[in-house]
Amino acid sequence: MSTHGDYIENVLSEEYTSIRVFKDDEGSKTELFQHNKTDNKLVKITSKNMNDHIFRILRGFRHTNLPTILDVCACEDHICVLEAYVEGETLESLLKKGILPHNVAIGYMLDICAALVFLHSQQIIHRDIKPSNVIITPEGKAVLIDFSAARLISSDKPVDTDNLGTVGYAAPEQYGVYQSLPPTDIYALGVMFNEMVAGIHPSVQTPDGKLGRIIRKCTDTQISSRYQTVGDLAHDLQKYKKYH
């Protein structure tokens, strides 16, 4: 019997051409397809470890700082997700050219904060914020991608059951100390922000003055000492931007 997964595969094979593989490792593959007639592009993600419920939540919304989810399919042994392709350059690639002016970095931070305010309102924690998961569009907008490590906040799971994330950006609680919560994403935001303005991990050095205090509050090892909401962080960033 034909399934929705079969339908997706048939459409891709008949109407699209694979033009690039972004990632292909154990249990996960991310591939770029281009429509044969319109040249429209989409990203196909298959994984044995992703939470399809998260993608089904996101499919019902559109947000300027998040990729549009086009379709989700739970197949026998994996999840298949189709996303609209986000044109642009990764923040990781951009930072290889050097640190960013403070006003530019804050602009990107506010874009990612806007994405996280929405995600957290849906009880979704991203858990893998880093420069390679941020796309800077030709218009200068920052878009947060890759939800393969995301999880839903759970009232009956006091600690994370899977240690996902990236070393250097992952908060201490992601290693089984506590459950991932909004301050978990804020920790990674702070690390990434310091890399944008100082070029190094905040454990080595942070900027002087108010900007450094903001970063240190993001990256405190104690979850209770960090900003508790992304909205609070965005408020301080906007205030800094206004007076500097």
Predicted features along the sequence, with ranges:
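Conserved short submotifs of the Hanks-type protein kinase catalytic core
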Residues: 76-90
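Activation segment signature within eukaryotic-like protein kinase domains
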Residues: 108-109
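AlphaC helix of the protein kinase catalytic domain
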Residues: 91-100
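Conserved HxN/HPN-centered segment at the entrance to the catalytic loop
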Residues: 62-71
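Catalytic-loop of the protein kinase fold
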Residues: 120-136
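Conserved activation segment of eukaryotic-like protein kinases, specifically the C-terminal portion
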Residues: 160-173
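ATP-binding glycine-rich loop module of kinase domains
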Residues: 19-56
